[in-house]
Amino acid sequence: MSDLHNESIFITGGGSGLGLALVERFIEEGAQVATLELSAAKVASLRQRFGEHILAVEGNVTCYADYQRAVDQILTRSGKLDCFIGNAGIWDHNASLVNTPAETLETGFHELFNVNVLGYLLGAKACAPALIASEGSMIFTLSNAARYPGGGGPLYTASKHAATGLIRQLAYELAPKVRVNGVGPCGMASDLRGPQALGQSETSIMQSLTPEKIAAILPLQFFPQPADFTGPYVMLASRRNNRALSGVMINADAGLAIRGIRHVAAGLDL
Protein backbone atom coordinates (compact mmCIF):
# COMPACT_ATOMS: atom_id res chain seq x y z
CA MET A 1 0.00 0.00 0.00
CA SER A 2 1.27 3.47 -0.89
CA ASP A 3 2.38 5.85 1.86
CA LEU A 4 -0.21 8.26 0.46
CA HIS A 5 -3.21 5.94 0.69
CA ASN A 6 -6.17 7.99 1.99
CA GLU A 7 -3.99 11.08 2.41
CA SER A 8 -5.89 14.28 1.55
CA ILE A 9 -4.06 16.24 -1.17
CA PHE A 10 -5.09 19.67 -2.49
CA ILE A 11 -3.55 20.76 -5.82
CA THR A 12 -4.10 24.07 -7.61
CA GLY A 13 -4.31 24.22 -11.40
CA GLY A 14 -5.15 20.54 -11.75
CA GLY A 15 -6.88 20.82 -15.11
CA SER A 16 -3.88 20.58 -17.43
CA GLY A 17 -0.12 20.23 -17.70
CA LEU A 18 1.82 19.47 -14.54
CA GLY A 19 -1.26 19.97 -12.38
CA LEU A 20 -3.16 17.28 -14.26
CA ALA A 21 -0.17 14.94 -14.07
CA LEU A 22 -0.09 15.48 -10.30
CA VAL A 23 -3.80 14.76 -10.02
CA GLU A 24 -3.30 11.51 -11.94
CA ARG A 25 -0.26 10.46 -9.91
CA PHE A 26 -1.75 11.13 -6.49
CA ILE A 27 -4.95 9.31 -7.42
CA GLU A 28 -2.78 6.36 -8.53
CA GLU A 29 -1.10 6.53 -5.11
CA GLY A 30 -4.50 6.11 -3.45
CA ALA A 31 -4.82 9.66 -2.16
CA GLN A 32 -8.03 11.67 -1.82
CA VAL A 33 -7.38 14.44 -4.34
CA ALA A 34 -8.94 17.89 -4.66
CA THR A 35 -8.10 20.71 -7.03
CA LEU A 36 -8.91 24.39 -7.48
CA GLU A 37 -9.16 25.13 -11.20
CA LEU A 38 -10.02 28.39 -12.97
CA SER A 39 -11.51 26.88 -16.14
CA ALA A 40 -15.08 25.62 -15.89
CA ALA A 41 -14.47 23.37 -18.90
CA LYS A 42 -11.44 21.78 -17.22
CA VAL A 43 -13.40 21.30 -13.99
CA ALA A 44 -16.10 19.47 -15.95
CA SER A 45 -13.47 17.36 -17.71
CA LEU A 46 -11.84 16.39 -14.41
CA ARG A 47 -15.17 15.36 -12.91
CA GLN A 48 -16.06 13.31 -15.98
CA ARG A 49 -12.67 11.61 -16.13
CA PHE A 50 -12.05 10.85 -12.45
CA GLY A 51 -15.55 10.76 -10.98
CA GLU A 52 -15.62 10.20 -7.22
CA HIS A 53 -11.81 10.17 -7.09
CA ILE A 54 -11.59 13.95 -7.58
CA LEU A 55 -13.07 16.96 -5.82
CA ALA A 56 -12.79 19.62 -8.52
CA VAL A 57 -13.67 23.15 -7.40
CA GLU A 58 -13.97 26.02 -9.86
CA GLY A 59 -12.17 29.08 -8.54
CA ASN A 60 -9.38 31.62 -8.84
CA VAL A 61 -6.11 31.29 -6.92
CA THR A 62 -5.99 35.08 -6.52
CA CYS A 63 -9.20 34.97 -4.44
CA TYR A 64 -8.94 33.92 -0.79
CA ALA A 65 -12.67 33.20 -0.59
CA ASP A 66 -12.33 30.63 -3.39
CA TYR A 67 -9.51 28.93 -1.50
CA GLN A 68 -11.54 28.88 1.71
CA ARG A 69 -14.53 27.43 -0.11
CA ALA A 70 -12.33 24.66 -1.50
CA VAL A 71 -10.77 23.90 1.89
CA ASP A 72 -14.21 23.74 3.51
CA GLN A 73 -15.32 21.20 0.90
CA ILE A 74 -12.13 19.17 1.39
CA LEU A 75 -12.66 19.01 5.15
CA THR A 76 -16.30 18.03 4.68
CA ARG A 77 -15.27 15.27 2.28
CA SER A 78 -12.11 13.94 3.94
CA GLY A 79 -12.17 15.33 7.46
CA LYS A 80 -8.58 16.50 7.09
CA LEU A 81 -5.97 18.00 4.78
CA ASP A 82 -2.49 16.44 4.62
CA CYS A 83 -0.76 18.30 1.79
CA PHE A 84 -1.30 21.53 -0.15
CA ILE A 85 0.41 21.78 -3.54
CA GLY A 86 0.51 25.32 -4.93
CA ASN A 87 0.99 24.75 -8.64
CA ALA A 88 -1.16 27.12 -10.72
CA GLY A 89 0.94 29.74 -12.47
CA ILE A 90 1.52 31.78 -15.61
CA TRP A 91 4.63 32.53 -17.70
CA ASP A 92 5.72 35.73 -19.45
CA HIS A 93 6.97 34.19 -22.72
CA ASN A 94 10.39 35.81 -22.17
CA ALA A 95 8.94 39.34 -22.37
CA SER A 96 12.04 41.52 -21.96
CA LEU A 97 12.49 44.78 -20.09
CA VAL A 98 13.55 46.70 -23.21
CA ASN A 99 10.82 45.44 -25.52
CA THR A 100 7.88 45.67 -23.10
CA PRO A 101 6.07 49.05 -22.95
CA ALA A 102 6.14 50.65 -19.49
CA GLU A 103 2.37 50.61 -18.99
CA THR A 104 2.20 46.96 -20.06
CA LEU A 105 5.12 46.11 -17.81
CA GLU A 106 3.28 47.52 -14.80
CA THR A 107 -0.03 45.79 -15.41
CA GLY A 108 1.73 42.57 -16.42
CA PHE A 109 3.72 42.64 -13.19
CA HIS A 110 0.62 42.88 -11.03
CA GLU A 111 -1.21 40.15 -12.93
CA LEU A 112 1.72 37.74 -12.93
CA PHE A 113 2.67 38.32 -9.29
CA ASN A 114 -0.98 38.00 -8.24
CA VAL A 115 -1.06 34.48 -9.67
CA ASN A 116 2.50 33.26 -9.07
CA VAL A 117 3.16 34.76 -5.63
CA LEU A 118 -0.06 36.02 -4.03
CA GLY A 119 -1.82 32.86 -5.20
CA TYR A 120 0.67 30.75 -3.25
CA LEU A 121 0.43 32.98 -0.19
CA LEU A 122 -3.37 32.92 -0.12
CA GLY A 123 -3.37 29.15 -0.54
CA ALA A 124 -0.95 28.78 2.34
CA LYS A 125 -3.12 31.02 4.50
CA ALA A 126 -6.30 29.08 3.76
CA CYS A 127 -4.68 25.68 4.26
CA ALA A 128 -2.46 26.44 7.27
CA PRO A 129 -4.96 25.66 10.07
CA ALA A 130 -5.83 22.24 8.64
CA LEU A 131 -2.19 21.43 7.91
CA ILE A 132 -1.09 22.46 11.40
CA ALA A 133 -3.77 20.16 12.79
CA SER A 134 -2.61 17.23 10.63
CA GLU A 135 1.10 18.12 10.84
CA GLY A 136 1.16 17.95 7.07
CA SER A 137 3.08 19.67 4.32
CA MET A 138 3.05 22.33 1.62
CA ILE A 139 4.77 21.97 -1.76
CA PHE A 140 5.09 24.80 -4.28
CA THR A 141 5.96 24.56 -7.95
CA LEU A 142 8.96 26.71 -8.81
CA SER A 143 11.02 26.67 -12.03
CA ASN A 144 14.58 26.71 -13.26
CA ALA A 145 13.86 30.48 -13.37
CA ALA A 146 13.90 30.41 -9.56
CA ARG A 147 17.66 29.85 -9.81
CA TYR A 148 18.84 31.18 -13.17
CA PRO A 149 18.12 34.07 -15.54
CA GLY A 150 16.95 33.15 -19.01
CA GLY A 151 14.06 30.89 -18.03
CA GLY A 152 11.62 33.73 -18.66
CA GLY A 153 11.58 37.51 -18.70
CA PRO A 154 12.11 39.72 -15.63
CA LEU A 155 8.48 39.37 -14.50
CA TYR A 156 8.46 35.58 -14.40
CA THR A 157 11.99 35.25 -13.06
CA ALA A 158 11.28 37.72 -10.26
CA SER A 159 8.06 35.91 -9.36
CA LYS A 160 9.80 32.56 -9.00
CA HIS A 161 12.61 34.07 -6.93
CA ALA A 162 9.90 35.60 -4.73
CA ALA A 163 8.23 32.21 -4.38
CA THR A 164 11.55 30.75 -3.24
CA GLY A 165 11.71 33.34 -0.47
CA LEU A 166 8.12 32.59 0.45
CA ILE A 167 8.91 28.89 0.83
CA ARG A 168 11.82 29.61 3.15
CA GLN A 169 9.81 32.02 5.29
CA LEU A 170 6.82 29.68 5.56
CA ALA A 171 9.11 26.76 6.40
CA TYR A 172 10.48 28.86 9.25
CA GLU A 173 7.12 30.16 10.49
CA LEU A 174 5.29 26.83 10.33
CA ALA A 175 8.00 24.58 11.79
CA PRO A 176 7.79 22.17 13.51
CA LYS A 177 4.17 21.49 12.56
CA VAL A 178 4.26 21.84 8.75
CA ARG A 179 6.99 20.98 6.24
CA VAL A 180 7.24 23.48 3.36
CA ASN A 181 9.23 22.71 0.20
CA GLY A 182 9.43 23.47 -3.51
CA VAL A 183 10.01 21.62 -6.77
CA GLY A 184 11.63 23.45 -9.69
CA PRO A 185 10.86 21.80 -13.04
CA CYS A 186 12.33 22.85 -16.37
CA GLY A 187 10.33 23.38 -19.56
CA MET A 188 7.87 20.65 -20.47
CA ALA A 189 4.90 19.85 -22.66
CA SER A 190 2.11 21.93 -21.12
CA ASP A 191 -0.59 24.50 -21.71
CA LEU A 192 1.13 27.14 -19.55
CA ARG A 193 -0.20 30.56 -20.59
CA GLY A 194 0.85 34.18 -20.06
CA PRO A 195 -0.74 37.30 -18.54
CA GLN A 196 -3.70 38.87 -20.30
CA ALA A 197 -2.02 42.25 -19.71
CA LEU A 198 0.78 41.16 -22.03
CA GLY A 199 -1.65 39.79 -24.62
CA GLN A 200 -0.54 36.23 -23.80
CA SER A 201 -3.59 34.67 -22.18
CA GLU A 202 -4.31 32.58 -25.29
CA THR A 203 -0.68 31.73 -26.01
CA SER A 204 0.76 28.51 -24.55
CA ILE A 205 4.40 27.88 -23.77
CA MET A 206 4.60 25.41 -26.66
CA GLN A 207 3.89 28.26 -29.08
CA SER A 208 7.06 29.98 -27.86
CA LEU A 209 9.37 27.01 -27.28
CA THR A 210 9.60 23.95 -29.50
CA PRO A 211 10.26 20.47 -28.08
CA GLU A 212 13.57 20.45 -29.94
CA LYS A 213 14.65 23.77 -28.41
CA ILE A 214 13.80 22.62 -24.89
CA ALA A 215 15.57 19.27 -25.30
CA ALA A 216 18.66 20.91 -26.80
CA ILE A 217 19.48 22.97 -23.69
CA LEU A 218 19.01 20.09 -21.23
CA PRO A 219 22.01 17.89 -20.39
CA LEU A 220 19.73 14.83 -20.34
CA GLN A 221 18.73 15.70 -23.93
CA PHE A 222 15.04 14.81 -23.89
CA PHE A 223 11.75 16.69 -24.04
CA PRO A 224 10.08 16.24 -20.65
CA GLN A 225 6.44 15.35 -20.17
CA PRO A 226 4.55 16.56 -17.07
CA ALA A 227 4.46 13.05 -15.58
CA ASP A 228 8.27 13.06 -15.50
CA PHE A 229 8.18 15.58 -12.64
CA THR A 230 5.64 14.04 -10.29
CA GLY A 231 8.07 11.84 -8.32
CA PRO A 232 9.57 14.62 -6.17
CA TYR A 233 6.09 15.80 -5.17
CA VAL A 234 5.14 12.29 -4.07
CA MET A 235 8.32 11.98 -2.03
CA LEU A 236 7.88 15.38 -0.37
CA ALA A 237 4.22 14.66 0.44
CA SER A 238 5.04 11.29 2.02
CA ARG A 239 5.38 11.32 5.79
CA ARG A 240 7.61 8.24 5.74
CA ASN A 241 9.89 9.37 2.90
CA ASN A 242 10.13 13.00 3.98
CA ARG A 243 10.48 13.43 7.70
CA ALA A 244 13.53 15.69 7.52
CA LEU A 245 13.15 18.08 4.56
CA SER A 246 11.72 21.57 4.98
CA GLY A 247 12.70 24.80 3.26
CA VAL A 248 14.21 22.73 0.44
CA MET A 249 13.93 23.42 -3.30
CA ILE A 250 14.39 20.30 -5.46
CA ASN A 251 15.70 21.02 -8.96
CA ALA A 252 13.84 18.67 -11.30
CA ASP A 253 15.45 20.22 -14.36
CA ALA A 254 16.86 17.36 -16.47
CA GLY A 255 20.37 18.30 -15.40
CA LEU A 256 20.15 22.01 -16.16
CA ALA A 257 21.74 22.83 -12.80
CA ILE A 258 24.96 21.22 -14.03
CA ARG A 259 25.67 24.25 -16.15
CA GLY A 260 22.75 26.71 -16.01
CA ILE A 261 21.38 28.42 -19.12
CA ARG A 262 24.58 29.29 -20.93
CA HIS A 263 24.22 32.53 -22.84
CA VAL A 264 27.07 34.96 -22.27
CA ALA A 265 24.72 37.95 -22.37
CA ALA A 266 21.18 38.46 -23.60
CA GLY A 267 21.71 42.08 -24.61
CA LEU A 268 24.35 41.68 -27.30
CA ASP A 269 21.96 43.02 -29.95
CA LEU A 270 20.78 46.09 -28.03
From Swiss-Prot:
Q: What does this protein do?
A: Converts 3-phenylpropionate-dihydrodiol (PP-dihydrodiol) and cinnamic acid-dihydrodiol (CI-dihydrodiol) into 3-(2,3-dihydroxylphenyl)propanoic acid (DHPP) and 2,3-dihydroxicinnamic acid (DHCI), respectively.
Q: Gene3D superfamilies under this entry?
A: NAD(P)-binding Rossmann-like Domain
One Pfam family this chain carries? adh_short
**EC number(s) on record?**
1.3.1.87
Source organism per entry reads Shigella sonnei (strain Ss046)
The protein's annotated catalytic reaction(s) are: 3-(cis-5,6-dihydroxycyclohexa-1,3-dien-1-yl)propanoate + NAD(+) = 3-(2,3-dihydroxyphenyl)propanoate + NADH + H(+); (2E)-3-(cis-5,6-dihydroxycyclohexa-1,3-dien-1-yl)prop-2-enoate + NAD(+) = (2E)-3-(2,3-dihydroxyphenyl)prop-2-enoate + NADH + H(+)
Q: Which UniProt keywords apply?
A: Aromatic hydrocarbons catabolism, NAD, Oxidoreductase
Name the PROSITE patterns for this protein: ADH_SHORT
| GO biological process assignments | 3-phenylpropionate catabolic process
What the record says about family reads: Belongs to the short-chain dehydrogenases/reductases (SDR) family.
Q: Where is the active site?
A: 156
Residue positions annotated to bind substrate are: 143
Give the metabolic or biological pathway. Answer: Aromatic compound metabolism; 3-phenylpropanoate degradation
Record NCBIfam families: 3PPDhyd_Dh_HcaB, PRK06200.1
Which protein, by its recorded name, is this? 3-phenylpropionate-dihydrodiol/cinnamic acid-dihydrodiol dehydrogenase
PANTHER family for this protein: 3-PHENYLPROPIONATE-DIHYDRODIOL_CINNAMIC ACID-DIHYDRODIOL DEHYDROGENASE, DEHYDROGENASE/REDUCTASE (SDR FAMILY) MEMBER 4
Coiled coil (UniProt feature): none
Binding positions for NAD(+)? 10-34
Molecular function GO labels:
2,3-dihydroxy-2,3-dihydro-phenylpropionate dehydrogenase activity
